[in-house]
Amino acid sequence: SILSADFLRLQEEITRMEQGGCDVLHIDVTDGHFVPNLTMGLCVAEAACRATKMRKDAHLMISRPQDFIKKFADAGADLILFHHEATSHPFEMIKYIRESGKMAGVALDPATPVRSIAHYLHAVDAVLLVTVCVGFGGQTYIDEMDAKVEELVSLRREKGLHFEIQVDGGLTP
């Protein structure tokens, strides 16, 4: 995630990621409402997207993702992840993302059961499990999340699906 980058040297940090073998740039976006923290806005995300040819994932930890999907798509995100907890209309979110020509993903807070998204897993390209208190960098991985990853892998296999599984938080070396 570029959340841990030095924003005064964003281009250098992204280049270092590429040279280190990264193939996805993860962009954490918070709004101070959905989570009690502000990270970066659209301008920084757009600059980061322009700075690389890596796949760009926009992780929208925001209260009204439907208001920003098109903006982050236009900024250069390839995969847009909305939080399950931020909407009661996940199929609409997926539709908005697809209409923007992008891949769609859903993110889950640590306390949210995996089964709560089972009814729409067939419609997403990725599921991101947040493995720390959502919205803040520099935290320790929640060990209990291992079981959640295993549950998601089993559910994907049971349903014969092929979505990507991502984890976010507490994974820096």
Describe each PLM feature range:
Residues 94-96, 112:
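Predominantly soluble domains enriched in secretory-pathway, periplasmic, or organellar proteins
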Residues 89, 113, 135-136:
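Short glycine-rich, flexible loops that bind phosphorylated cofactors or substrates
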Residues 1-79, 87-89, 96-104, 117-124, ...:
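Conserved N-terminal beta1-alpha1 strand-loop-helix module at the mouth
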Residues 170-173:
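Acidic, divalent-metal-coordinating active-site segment for phosphoryl/phosphodiester hydrolysis
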Residues 112, 133, 152-155:
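ABC family nucleotide-binding domain
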Residues 26, 166-167:
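Generic enzyme active-site microenvironment
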Residues 107-111:
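Short gly/ser/thr-rich secondary-structure transition/capping motifs
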